[in-house]
Structure formats: structure tokens, C-alpha cells
């Protein structure tokens, strides 16, 4: 059974008197930094000098400096930049200030696991990964709760890396809900697989395929949108609350029979074989190599596919229907 840790297992005293530099002020950066600050810890945000987020961070009452300046004054350096930018920023602006006894912190293991960042042996390297988007990390903290998270230690130079990881997790509110001990390898590979095969890649293609099937058969696009996209949230909420069995308990017997009889015709043995290939490409570094190369050549495939998918009919129909639904929050609200 995996080991879980809670508030009683962690002490913020380990971080008292230390400076925590949070590099980046995006979804996770703003949430983790504000939670750490509200936990009574000393936080500085590291940003580019021309970053549009500089004033946002200052408005939230946070100290802001350039990445290099923040790294120089920090005892713990949390890198919350996009995966594809981390290695370059680390080499140029963080590594020169990563002196013995400091801690390097991550919320995703990509760059450590795939060898893009190789820290010196005399620093602690650990991960605290909230299993939630940043806005929920912040909101639940403010409500007195928290979101679950993962912790892992890659390098324990001080002999206290696990305790420091737990303290950091407590500072952002994750130990209120519980944190699971894992490894950089496990977090990285399972996270990428979940995104590609299920949560993002799998779901996106399933939705579009269902929509296309109905529209090509002559059904109204609006009806296809409701059946294949809009109602997905209702089903996912049930699964989130109590697993697949809870969802099946809550739907009609007709829907449950269709689930049991037809599901395996959609996710076939061939699909499962392809999932194993996807996982193998993550494990052997093929995906990481392709993604890093894609960024080095200015993302030609990424940009082309993004533009093409944005023009899919489901996007236009969805925008029109959502405009009629005042109960749906608009982006940015």
C-alpha cells in the first residue's frame, strides 16, 4: 500500500527563516507562492525583467526579482516554468547560484527524469506535485482545505530532503488532503501517459469522433455537441465522486447496459495494445526527445495541428451553445 502523509507528519519550522524562490507565476506559480506566503514563509518570485506577470505578483503582496536574483537569495528554488523552458533557464540563471546546501524543487519530474537538468550532488532535489490545477490549489487553501499531492526525493544531500518536501507540501496546503510518496520516474511516466492516452489525447479524440459520427449520419450538430461533449462533465463528476461504480449506479439501466456491452467495442484489444506502445515511447524517452526537438524547431507540427483542431466544427457549435448558457463561467472569470 502506498504511503500517505498528512499535516501531522510535516513541520513548517524546517522552512522558517529560509527564502523560497518560486520561478514563474502561472497557474501553479501564483497558487503555490501565495499559499506559502499565507503559511508565514518568506517567498520571492523569479521572473523575466519584462514579464507581464511582474505587477500581478507585486499586487498580490509578493516580492519579485529576476530569476537569477531570486536564485541567488533563495535557500529553496521551485521551478514552475513550462517543461520545455526549464533546462535553458536552469543552465543560464539558476545553476550559477545553486550552491551547496540549497534545495531544488519541482512539481513535475520531466526535466530530472529525462536528464535535461542534472543538479550538483551537494543539493537536495525533491518534488511536490499538487494533483490539481493552480486555481484549485489556491481556492481550497483559502477555504481551509487543500488538494492531494505527490512527493518524491531524487537527491537527499542533506539527509532531510523528505522532511523538507513534506514541509513544502504543508506550506501549499497539500498535506491537509494527503500526499502520496512516489518517485520522479513514476510521477513523470504516469502523468504523461494519463495526459496522452486518457485525460487529454484520448478524451479529445473520443469526443470529436463521436460528434463526427452523429453529424455525418445527419443529426443536428447541436444535438451531437450535447450528447458527446456537454454531458461529459456530468458523467465525470459522478466518477470523480465515487468511481465508475458510482457513475453506473446513478445512470439509467439502459445507459449502464450500453456501457457494459458497447464500451469494449470502442476501447478494443487493439486500442489497449496501442496504449502500451504509447507508454513504451514515454518510458524509453521517445516522446520527450520528440517534444524537445519540436520546440527547438519552433513547433511546426504543434502549431499546425493546434490551428487545424481549432477549426473543427465542434468548436464553433460549442461556442454558440455556451453563449446561451449563463451558468457556464467564461474563460477568465
Swiss-Prot record:
Residues noted as binding Mg(2+) 2 in the record, renumbered to the chain: 191, 227, 231
Q: Which pathway, metabolic or otherwise, does it act in?
A: Amino-acid biosynthesis; L-isoleucine biosynthesis; L-isoleucine from 2-oxobutanoate: step 2/4; Amino-acid biosynthesis; L-valine biosynthesis; L-valine from pyruvate: step 2/4
Q: Where is the KARI N-terminal Rossmann domain?
A: 2-182
Q: What is its EC number?
A: 1.1.1.86
**Domain (KARI C-terminal knotted) ranges:** 183-328
Gene3D superfamilies xref list? 6.10.240.10, NAD(P)-binding Rossmann-like Domain (3.40.50.720)
Q: Which GO terms describe its cellular component?
A: cytosol
List required co-factors: Mg(2+)
* Binding positions for NADP(+) per the UniProt entry: 25-28, 48, 51, 83-86, 134
Under the heading PROSITE patterns, the entry gives: KARI_C (PS51851), KARI_N (PS51850)
**Could you tell me which Pfam families the record lists for this protein?**
KARI_C, KARI_N
Entry keyword set: Amino-acid biosynthesis, Branched-chain amino acid biosynthesis, Magnesium, Metal-binding, NADP, Oxidoreductase
For this chain's UniProt record, which GO biological process terms are given?
A: isoleucine biosynthetic process; L-valine biosynthetic process
Binding residues for substrate, per the UniProt record? 252
CC cofactor note: Binds 2 magnesium ions per subunit.
Q: What terms describe the molecular function in GO for this protein?
A: ketol-acid reductoisomerase activity; magnesium ion binding; NADP binding
Which reaction(s) are listed as its catalytic activity? (2R)-2,3-dihydroxy-3-methylbutanoate + NADP(+) = (2S)-2-acetolactate + NADPH + H(+); (2R,3R)-2,3-dihydroxy-3-methylpentanoate + NADP(+) = (S)-2-ethyl-2-hydroxy-3-oxobutanoate + NADPH + H(+)
Q: What residues sit in the active site?
A: 108
Task: Locate the residues binding Mg(2+) 1.
Answer: 191, 195
- Which NCBIfam families does the UniProt entry name for this protein? ilvC, PRK05479.1, PRK13403.1
Quote the PANTHER family the UniProt record gives.
Answer: KETOL-ACID REDUCTOISOMERASE, MITOCHONDRIAL
Q: What does this protein do?
A: Involved in the biosynthesis of branched-chain amino acids (BCAA). Catalyzes an alkyl-migration followed by a ketol-acid reduction of (S)-2-acetolactate (S2AL) to yield (R)-2,3-dihydroxy-isovalerate. In the isomerase reaction, S2AL is rearranged via a Mg-dependent methyl migration to produce 3-hydroxy-3-methyl-2-ketobutyrate (HMKB). In the reductase reaction, this 2-ketoacid undergoes a metal-dependent reduction by NADPH to yield (R)-2,3-dihydroxy-isovalerate.
Q: Which family does it belong to?
A: Belongs to the ketol-acid reductoisomerase family.
The protein here is known as Ketol-acid reductoisomerase (NADP(+))
Organism from which the protein derives: Desulfitobacterium hafniense (strain Y51)
Which gene does this sequence derive from?
Answer: ilvC
